A protein has these predicted regions:
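AMP-forming adenylation/ATP pyrophosphatase catalytic core
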Residues: 118-292
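ATP-dependent adenylation/nucleotidyltransferase module used to activate substrates
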Residues: 1-163
Length: 292
């Protein structure tokens, strides 16, 4: 948003591009664009993005986040939109060395190269640390009005936000679930144990505890009533619902191929999290397709 404002202040029309996937959405972008009166185009690249997440060419960060491959994909999609909007170039808010893996000089160059639009990418916030682009050399953009931010500190960015009265902006991670350790563990487990994964199976990872009983099955346990309202939306026809007969404790979903031993394990997990957990015994119900 700061990069967009910087270019807008040169009298250049700017259109926001936001990407939507299984792991992040457009809500932050919508709020930010309103603050600088910038139109927004939302691009849903969920399927292609997910295929990349499974096997990123340039590896991952601390968790499941393939930032270099992700940025390159975003730049490619943005480049393909240039003609649609009769636009001249792409700007991004990247800052040299702000992130050790994905925003070092080599990574920034990799993103440009693999995007297929390397000559059309401008990084206004750190442009003075980089070689001039064709947009600067031909006078389309005034290089002297661009910035030289580098490093991990966000002090300069926060000062700019205050100066421009931009008060609603996201945390540095930007709302990407792939950067969250707990979510990353659940996604990694899913990919390690299933050859094919459906959208609903990815969505439900955002909620509850996911416990692998065997390579062929797992249980999902809600932490509270609000989580259960979300989890139950993704319940499959073949799932087993495991509940305590005499309490309103946490329901458990058993998913996958299972045997009697797995059912008993799911029952013990249900007993562990229900309100009767301190009792000598907990009576358990198994429900499938509405039948107990």
């Amino acid at each position: 948003i700061l990069a967009a404002k910087l270019i807008k202040d040169q009298g250049i029309e700017v259109i926001g591009i936001c990407f939507k996937s299984y792991f992040f959405n457009e809500e932050n972008a919508k709020r930010m664009c309103k603050q600088i009166d910038m139109p927004l185009e939302v691009v849903d690249f969920s399927e292609e993005h997910f295929e990349m997440v499974k096997d990123p060419k340039h590896g991952r960060g601390k968790n499941m986040n393939p930032c270099i491959d992700c940025h390159a994909m975003m730049m490619r999609y943005s480049g393909e939109l240039l003609k649609k909007f009769d636009a001249d170039f792409i700007i991004t808010g990247e800052v040299l060395n702000q992130r050790p893996m994905s925003q070092n000089r080599q990574a920034l160059n990799t993103v440009k190269k693999e995007s297929g639009f390397s000559e059309k990418i401008l990084r206004p916030l750190c442009a003075l640390n980089l070689e001039p682009t064709e947009m600067e050399l031909n006078g389309l953009v005034d290089r002297e009005k661009l910035l030289k931010i580098s490093g991990r500190s966000r002090k300069t960015q926060m000062e700019l936000a205050e100066k421009w009265n931009i008060v609603d902006y996201p945390s540095p991670a930007g709302g990407c679930k792939l950067t969250e350790p707990g979510y990353a563990i659940r996604l990694s487990d899913l990919l390690d144990n299933q050859e094919t994964v459906a959208k609903d199976e990815i969505e439900v990872l955002k909620y509850g505890r996911h416990m692998r009983i065997s390579p062929k099955n797992k249980v999902i346990v809600a932490r509270n009533g609000e989580e259960w309202k979300e989890i139950v939306k993704f319940k499959k026809e073949d799932d087993i619902l495991v509940t305590s007969k005499n309490s309103t404790g946490a329901p458990v979903i058993l998913r996958g191929e299972f045997n009697k031993e797995d059912l008993e394990t799911a029952a013990r997990i249900c007993g562990r999290y229900c309100k009767e957990k301190d009792s000598d015994a907990v009576e358990i119900n198994y429900e499938k397709n509405g039948e107990i």
